[in-house]
């Protein structure tokens, strides 16, 4: 069902609902300057609720799609949610009390957006606003551009009944002053997608790949998926690609794949998960010759001392040293080695001082880390930190 429900705020307070079989299917109430629209689904007893400030004379639209619902006030998107299962409200259902409400079929805009949607100045402390915050960041360098993919967060990780319903947004810069906003890189397009989790970017033979896991919870293994692009701005999901980690790992919590190509000619993937038998968090290590078929390397590249899962792994070679990065309880730690994939040791101070779960990319000879500063919950504002290295590999941090 793709439906558009439209009405005008002609009086306050306002209330109407639709119900059948003794159960509310859709409910709208507005008072004290706030409107709440609740939609019920067969997936969960609790409804999904959209909210916005409201006043007399405002024109309201509620858009119901199978994978997303939206609340517009006077043509501006004020809130959105991402359902699962089937909406109990159907076209043709009535409302009580009777009032002037328009219900019609709704067609999504299928036009391809331009590669640059808008621009803004200075990303330090930036977030999109209007209820949208920055989550985990995934930076990479392409030629002379520094790109940041980040998790779009509404409701402080509370969307989709707490699954998060995160999607990947995309910005870039050439000077860290003016930033370009690009089309959404990975969107939720299926109600079976609970959240597009953190991942990584890689280029191969002129094609750009984004690897991530799709989480749905309820004991369902999280598959590793990917999206591809020929221009670096418009990504399409590869419906033919996907796999889950082996049973020695906790499959439901597998996430945050970091993919790199190494000197051995192989592609390596590191994933956040846990060893089931040992009950210890770890970074699983997978390898591939072609980025199509992946095999377990045999042992994790890192195992925690306890059940804490090392999140958002990063890996790179910089100034003659190999670096393995991961976050514990939101704080990023780095390890150093002279050899790839082994022999990593933590320096005396292993913390990367860039707030929550930062990852890095080399730019103009320095490592530039991107993280986010929380604002009132999970999501927040983007933040950066630059770093160079000492001869022993220890990083020296400075403000960007």
Q: Language-model features: where?
A:
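Short hydrophobic/aromatic patches on beta-strands that form ligand-binding or substrate-lining surfaces
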Residues: 1-11, 62-64
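Basic DNA-binding region of bZIP-type proteins
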Residues: 67
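A generic local secondary-structure boundary/capping motif
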Residues: 258, 358-359
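Mobile "lid/hinge" segments at catalytic clefts and subdomain interfaces of large enzymes
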Residues: 361-363
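Beta-rich carbohydrate-recognition and catalytic domains
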Residues: 16, 23-28, 34-55, 59-60, ...
